[in-house]
Amino acid sequence: MKNEQMALLFSEATPYIQKYHGKTLVIKYGGNAMVNDELKLAVMNDLVTLTLLGVRVVLVHGGGPAINDMLKKVGKESRFVNGLRYTDAETMGIVQQVLAGQVNKDLVALLKGRGVGLCGMDGHMIMCRRKTDADLGFVGEIERVNTTLIDHLLADSFIPVIATVGMDKNGVPYNINADTAAAEIAIALHAEKLVSMTDIVGLLRDKNDESTLIPEVELSEIEGYKAEGVIAGGMLPKIEGMADAIRQGVHEAVIIDGRMPHSVLLEMFSDRGAGTMFYRRGNR
């Protein structure tokens, strides 16, 4: 990169660095975006860069493919209802093992001492009840997010890395959809921005054609996209969570391609951003 290009890059980024300094960013890192170790390391390095620039970063992660692999090893089939994993008692044990154990600790290790691994059960962080609007087994609906642990870690410039296993008032563990958990955590923290890093470039009119990316969606358009089938399956909890977050005070919410190197830095610090931005009319 030439010196002139470098200068222009920093010139473009400067107002965004000022904008987000001291603000809270909640990132949901989807399991489908964790395509290889090299890319995961690059993403974690970008998160460290954000903290060095004064952004308060909270990482909420999924781990669907790793859970699917473990279920396959024990001879269990993965089943989904409206984008949510059916979770019987045996599956719940596997979810805990994979999310709070394997995936969480792998990400913390890549942060090289700047991350602290947490589970939603720690410190009564994610309190929930059994989701009752469908037969999903041990899938939880969040009742309350306690941010005490998160606040302490952010104050000391650590990155909380949160596995989305919550519990009810009796200590029974529940599988929580990571998109839903990220949105609720963003709301509870009064976050400036919620970013979902996934394995697609954003919301597509045609899921098989990346050129049909929808760069911006106003909240009133969401129901129409649902009716058209543009928002369906795993996109439902993702976008419903983002819409709820915006309605409850989170300023910005965006879906970006977590497989693209440095996509989170591009989204945060460039004029063109990345992916699909969700917004509320009058709140831009």
Predicted regions, residues:
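Nucleotide/pyrophosphate-binding catalytic subdomain
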Residues: 1-259, 266, 272, 279-284
